[in-house]
Amino acid sequence: MHGLAKAPKRLQAEALFTAAMADAAENLYLNEQCIPVYRGEFWTAKQRQAASIHEVSYRACFKPQLPAYFISRLSAPGDTVYDPFSGRGTTAIEAALHGRRIIANDINPLSAILTQPRLAPPAPAAIAARLAAIDLDVQSTVAIDLSMFFHADTLREIAALRHYLHTRHVDGDEDAIDRWIRMVATNRLTGHSKGFFSVYTLPPNQATSAQRQIKINQQRAQTPDYRDTRALIVRKSHQLQRDLDADQSKALQTAAARARFLTRMADDTREIADQAIQLTVTSPPFLDIVQYANDNWLRCWFNSLDAEAIAAGITMSRTLQDWNQSMARVFAELYRVTRINGWVAFEVGEIRKGKIRLEEHVVPLGTSAGFACEAILINEQRFTKTANIWGVGNNAAGTNSNRIVVFRKT
């Protein structure tokens, strides 16, 4: 039995979450618990422009302002911040920029490939020099047909770069510059502008199949044109680093030396010690909305990874009961690794057209694991174009929301 009722703002929540910014405070009555709910625009692009180093395309990721909000309020410099579903590494990168230690976990190895190099950005001149030294004219075998995406000369360069990076990695010679080039190339494989290696296709966070691309080419009467892979990698490298100042670069380098990247199920992170984490900021997979293998098959090919094997290990619960059971195990593990008075900010959403509000399921999962649920924050922002992230629709016409359940270990 649950419901919402107007209630006075609680002083503790005001102190922690600057509730003066909220339009209203409510109570959610859920399983005999009274949870304060705060709605408002808690962070905006104007309040804090996200650093350019975040600009890596990845399906289903929150904006950097979300982890920044909690990192700045619920942790201090030197504390460890964690994300068990790291994705493109938004929490890890933002925590590093704030001077925190970081641990990032994701069962998908592409997560570390896209995140770790951005903690140690090489100088653009060094990137250009390394690319110039790689022989991209060498013929390398490509076992799958990618002619619907790439011009033959572009594909030759991609295959040669893939072979070079794979050899460097296997031989143990891969360095920070190689890892950076791998990260940028992975991000530039396919997209909908001249900044990508491919002919026009879906945005890079929505990879399409070879069969679907053939239809796109037919519909647009297009054929793949040549793209200079070296030039595009250098260009994107400049874009990623364009607004990094000396303090931010130092913060990233400091975090890089101590950063830990895990590739495990989120409910079994045995490498993390008990009570090691001050703050977790994360957003788990939501039921069956995002199909990782379909989205990442080409990125996996470029990085010599088995997309189907990776997908088999990713939580894609098709029923709410299965999802609850999976998240219950995750919360038990989060309770183990969280220090006393540490925090978890767990971002969920309204899914299936608002028929399921996952926060109402997450609250009892967290409290059953031992956490105290301190509040639910619903960040509401106006937008001017259609938004649909994670399959999460708009809570009302003209607004988009993040729904974050905030727990504390007492």
Where are these regions (language model features)?
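Conserved proline-anchored active-site loop of SAM-dependent methyltransferases
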Residues: 64-67, 79-98, 102-109, 115, ...
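Mobile active-site "lid"/loop adjacent to the S-adenosyl-L-methionine
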Residues: 285-330, 341
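Conserved phosphoryl-transfer catalytic core
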Residues: 109-170, 305-313
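SAM-dependent nucleic-acid methyltransferase catalytic core
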Residues: 167-279, 287-288
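Class I S-adenosyl-L-methionine
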Residues: 354-363, 367, 371-410
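S-adenosyl-L-methionine
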Residues: 1-77
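Alpha-helical packing segments of well-folded alpha/beta enzyme cores
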Residues: 63-66, 157, 161, 323-330, ...
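Conserved Class I SAM-dependent methyltransferase catalytic core
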Residues: 313-376
